UniProtKB/Swiss-Prot annotation:
GO molecular function: protein tyrosine phosphatase activity
Catalysed transformations (reactions): O-phospho-L-tyrosyl-[protein] + H2O = L-tyrosyl-[protein] + phosphate
Name this polypeptide is given: Probable tyrosine phosphatase protein J2
Active site: residue positions: 227 (phosphocysteine intermediate)
PANTHER family, A to Z: LD27988P (PTHR19134:SF534), RECEPTOR-TYPE TYROSINE-PROTEIN PHOSPHATASE (PTHR19134)
Gene of this entry: J3
One family name in Pfam for this protein: Y_phosphatase
Domain Tyrosine-protein phosphatase: 21-286
Keywords: Hydrolase, Protein phosphatase
InterPro entries given in the database record: Prot-tyrosine_phosphatase-like, Protein-Tyr_Phosphatase, PTP_cat, Tyr_Pase_cat, Tyr_Pase_dom
Domain of life assignment: Viruses
Length: 297
């Protein structure tokens, strides 16, 4: 079923967000996309999908099966889904605590997909359930069954940390890996700084574009985004990328359409109202800064 075209021109979008009743319209739009019983139920939704795969049951939507991530060995990577960008198939892999139970499988997924950028969109330093696969000490190597991961350099910025890594397989083949961790995602999931997230996003976007321009080992793999807190932070990143790419190419955008496309690939995603509203704040901030729009009175 085709997605309804709800795209807006840049000026129309900016004027819409600045209207006094824009928030109520955004909430109404969100409610039309996300069923009420699904709101905030990300963890249970993903568990349901994984259980269905384990039992070889048919999923409610067949396309979800095609978006799951398999290794070359045909093993499934639980809670990992391919997500398309704007006119870019499988630009992302979205995961939830993917290396929590099997770090080797997670690293194999990165290797098989030629991943060179890993992103964590929420702070996890204090999370007990996060299994960090690299060392926090520079020039330190951690050895797993099938891989070694070396921490080369840790670069700390005001709202994110960039860790430069080298992933080496059993044959001694090595690949560089850049890990970006966003450290400014608010604990309340609401008090965001759009400029901080945009700066984080564009640092990643710039590196990805540079890697594609100067690729040395085949096609650059998907950007892998690992969400730790079971919120929609990883989907916020994808929706932002889809919308900004579309507006640069066409001069139009639709957050609703972008969210629907992501939800076609990842069951139960973007099911927190705060995160949906944040997408509007992000894109409004970007457009206002980029086009230097004077506030309409």
């Amino acid at each position: 079923m085709p997605i309804e075209d709800k795209r807006m021109r840049i000026m129309d979008f900016i004027n819409f967000v600045r209207k006094p009743d824009s928030l109520s319209c955004i909430i109404q739009e969100y409610r039309a996309i996300v069923p009420e019983q699904e709101d905030g139920a990300s963890k249970s939704c993903n568990q349901a999908v994984n259980r269905a795969q384990d039992e070889n049951n048919a999923l409610p939507i067949v396309r979800l099966v095609h978006s799951r991530v398999n290794l070359f060995s045909k093993e499934k990577v639980m809670s990992a889904r391919y997500v398309d960008g704007y006119n870019h198939k499988q630009k992302f892999i979205i995961t939830i605590n993917s290396c929590e139970n099997n770090t080797d499988k997670y690293l194999q997924m990165l290797w098989d997909n030629n991943v060179q950028i890993v992103v964590t969109t929420s702070s996890h330093a204090e999370k007990n359930n996060f299994n960090r696969f690299w060392s926090l000490n520079e020039r330190t190597v951690i050895t797993y069954n099938n891989f070694q991961i070396e921490t080369l350099e840790i670069i700390t910025k005001p709202h994110f940390v960039l860790t430069l890594l080298v992933l080496t397989d059993q044959k001694g083949q090595a690949r560089k890996l850049s890990h970006f961790q966003y450290t400014a995602w608010p604990a309340d999931g609401f008090s965001h700084d759009p400029k901080a997230f945009l700066d984080f996003f564009f640092n990643i976007d710039s590196l990805y574009a540079d890697l594609r321009k100067h690729k040395t080992i085949g096609n650059v793999g998907p950007i892998t985004i690992d969400c730790i807190d079971n919120n929609s932070s990883s989907e916020v990143f994808c929706v932002l990328d889809i919308c900004l790419t579309e507006v640069k190419k066409t001069g139009m955008l639709s957050i609703a359409n972008a969210v629907k496309k992501v939800r076609q690939k990842k069951y139960g995603c973007m099911n927190r109202l705060n995160d949906y509203v944040f997408c509007y704040h992000l894109i409004h901030a970007y457009l206002s800064m980029t086009f230097d729009i004077v506030k309409v009175r």
